[in-house]
Regions:
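Glycine-centered flexibility motif
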Residues: 5, 12, 79-81, 193-196, ...
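Short, structured secondary-structure boundary patches
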Residues: 3-9, 173-177, 308-312, 352-359
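Non-transmembrane, interaction-prone segments in cytosolic or luminal domains
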Residues: 7, 13, 24-45, 154-162, ...
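C-terminal substrate-recognition/cap domain of FAD-linked oxidoreductases
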Residues: 90-91, 97-317, 323-325, 329-332, ...
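Exposed alpha-helical structural elements
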Residues: 52, 56, 67, 198, ...
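FAD-binding subdomain of flavoenzyme oxidoreductases
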Residues: 1-141, 366-377, 381-403
Length: 403
């Protein structure tokens, strides 16, 4: 996931690099999608699948501009499924790829795609910035974003402590030397470039800036530099293993990824997470937090015993509360991992645009047979998947325990 996130920041979203696609619809028709002008769309035979769907999508976009503007927040993540906002490109052309990208198999089966490839920077380095509190790391992140970093990852004390008590810490301890101050949060600030000398200049300038801020009483108390892919990979391996260790907690309660990928504008992230932590603490839950602070994405997995019926009720309560919280901070419940079984909240985030989203579903799948209950139905009153009504392994585990 870490490498995916870094590529996303460098190159943009999938839809930015899909040149054309071929999809098979439920009727057996094939749909060829690409970016075309209004004139090219109008010139297509009216009986063709491309004309029928292309003209309908164009009308839905052009007739709902105010609703689109209100529904789609200004984020570097997207209100996926269905991306009506980007049916028109910045040049005014029609991009039929945009609706299929992120549709989670609800519109058709993509059988072929032509994509654009971009070169990745060859040089890489990372600065591990250390804090006495996770909130200090979060509040500092916005300022750190002003220095040209490729990515900024944050990790809380729960995840850090798991790493410190694991053998993986031996490989990165040099970057986190002992201090009289207690390490409770880190920002991992990655820089990339195509030129080694240019990268070194950026990183050294950033290091000097951190020294100056620390001397003036800034939030961080230390930092260390990892240069080159081998050293950087050591740090990322620590982060990856620590997150994996979250899933191995002792006892019946295990981290559950149901509010896994909230996303808010980066400038709202620190106060958003502050309230998010208060929400989870009020339910006396254990949890670990990590995320992509430059993108405003937070990953959190509260520990629940899903064999207990009251935990399922709590999962519903927490999700409802987090939905309200993300709306308050102009964000999304799903910043990276799609809607899936959380689709019941799609009408909340699409708002007045939701009927148009349902029209897209009806255009492609009027019988609601492709991944039914996810993202949208062919009519606004079509039932959607609910998080506390999907089959869970815990249901089977409960029968084993009871038996």
């Amino acid at each position: 996931e870490i490498q995916f996130v870094i590529v996303l920041r460098l190159a943009g979203k999938t839809r930015d690099h899909v040149l054309s696609m071929r999809a098979v619809l439920l009727t057996g028709e094939t749909l060829e999608t690409s970016v075309i002008s209004d004139e090219e769309l109008d010139a297509l035979p009216e009986s063709s699948t491309e004309s029928r769907i292309g003209r309908a999508l164009r009308s839905l976009h052009d007739e709902n501009l105010d609703e689109i503007e209100a529904a789609f927040p200004v984020l570097n993540r997207c209100l996926t499924g269905y991306d009506l906002k980007h049916v028109r490109t910045t040049d005014g052309d029609i991009d039929l790829n945009a609706v299929l990208c992120g549709s989670e198999g609800t519109l058709g089966l993509i059988s072929e795609a032509t994509i654009n490839l971009e070169p990745l920077p060859t040089e890489i380095g990372l600065v591990a910035v250390q804090y006495e509190s996770f909130m200090d790391a979060l509040f500092d992140a916005r300022e750190l974003m002003q220095h040209g970093a490729t990515s900024i990852e944050t990790v809380d004390s729960t995840v850090l402590n798991l790493a410190m008590n694991d053998f993986v810490w031996d490989s990165v301890q040099a970057y986190f030397p002992s201090s009289e101050k207690t390490l409770q949060g880190i920002n991992l600030v990655e820089f990339t470039d195509f030129d080694a000398a240019s990268l070194a200049l950026k990183m050294d300038a950033f290091s000097r800036h951190l020294d100056t801020v620390a001397e003036a009483g800034g939030r961080s108390f230390a930092h260390a530099i990892a240069r080159g892919r081998a050293q950087v990979n050591q740090v990322w391996a620590m982060r990856k293993r620590a997150v994996g260790l979250l899933g191995g907690l002792q006892g019946t309660k295990k981290p559950v990824a149901f509010v896994e990928d909230t996303c808010v504008p980066p400038e709202n992230l620190a106060p958003f997470i502050g309230e998010f932590r208060e929400l989870l603490d009020a339910h006396a839950l254990d949890y670990g937090m990590f995320g992509h602070v430059d993108a405003g994405v937070l990953h959190v997995r509260p520990a629940l015993d899903l064999k207990a019926p009251e935990s399922l009720e709590l999962m519903r309560t927490i999700t409802d509360q987090v939905v309200d919280l993300t709306k308050k901070y102009h964000g999304l419940l799903w910043g990276e991992h799609g809607k899936g079984v959380r689709s019941e909240y799609a009408p909340v985030f699409f708002g007045a645009l939701y009927p148009a989203i349902c029209q897209i579903k009806a255009l492609f799948d009027p019988q609601n047979r492709l991944n039914p209950g996810k993202i949208a139905g062919p009519t606004p009153d079509t039932p959607l998947r609910k998080i506390d009504e999907v089959p869970l392994r815990a249901h089977s585990d409960r029968r084993i325990v009871e038996g």
